[in-house]
Amino acid sequence: MMNMIEWTKHVLESDDTKLIYWLTLLMVCMIVDTILGIVIARINPKEKFSSFKMKTGILIKVSEMIIALLAVPFALPFPAGLPLLYTVYTALCVSEMYSIFGHLRVVDDKSNFLSIIEGFFKQTYRKDKGDK
C-alpha cells in the first residue's frame, strides 16, 4: 500500500504528469459517457437508437479530445497557460460527468448543474439543522 502512495506522489510531482492525468480522466469520462449512451439507447424501449446521434456524439468527443491535445503546445509557453489548461480540462470533465448523470437520470436537460449542487447543500443543511 505504501508503494502505491509513493508512486502517486511521484506521478503528481511534475506538471507534465498532471496534464496527462487530466487528459486520462477526460478520456475515461468520455468513454463511460459513450458506452452508457449506447447501452441505454439499446435497452430502453422508450429511447429510439439513432446511429446518426451516436456518430455525432462520437465525432464531438473526438474533436474535443483533439482540441484538448492541441491546446497543450500552444498554452504552455505562456505564464497563464497551465492554469488555463487545468480550467479547460476541468470544465470538459464536469461537462462529461453532467452528461453521464443525464444518462443515469440523475439530472435532466432542463436543470443546470449549479441548481443541483445548491439543492444538495440545502438538503444537507436542513438535515443538520434538524439533528440539533
UniProtKB/Swiss-Prot annotation:
- The stretches that face the Cytoplasmic side, renumbered to this chain, are 1-61, 108-132
Q: Where in the cell is it found?
A: Host cell inner membrane
Per its UniProt record, what Pfam families does this chain match?
A: Phage_holin_4_1 (PF05105)
Example of a GO biological process term: killing of cells of another organism
List, alphabetically, the GO terms of the cellular component aspect: host cell plasma membrane; membrane
Positions in the Periplasmic compartment: 81-85
**Sections of the chain in a coiled coil:** none
Q: Where are the transmembrane segments?
A: 62-80, 86-107
**Which membrane topology term applies here?**
Multi-pass membrane protein
Keywords, sorted A to Z: Cytolysis, Host cell inner membrane, Host cell lysis by virus, Host cell membrane, Host membrane, Late protein, Membrane, Transmembrane, Transmembrane helix, Viral release from host cell
Q: Do the record's keywords include Transmembrane helix?
A: yes
Q: Show the domain comment.
A: Isoform Holin has 3 transmembrane regions whereas isoform Antiholin lacks the first transmembrane region.
Per the record, the similarity remark reads:
Belongs to the bacteriophage holin family. phi29likevirus holin subfamily.
State the name under which the record lists this protein. Answer: Antiholin
- Lineage of producing organism: Viruses, Duplodnaviria, Heunggongvirae, Uroviricota, Caudoviricetes
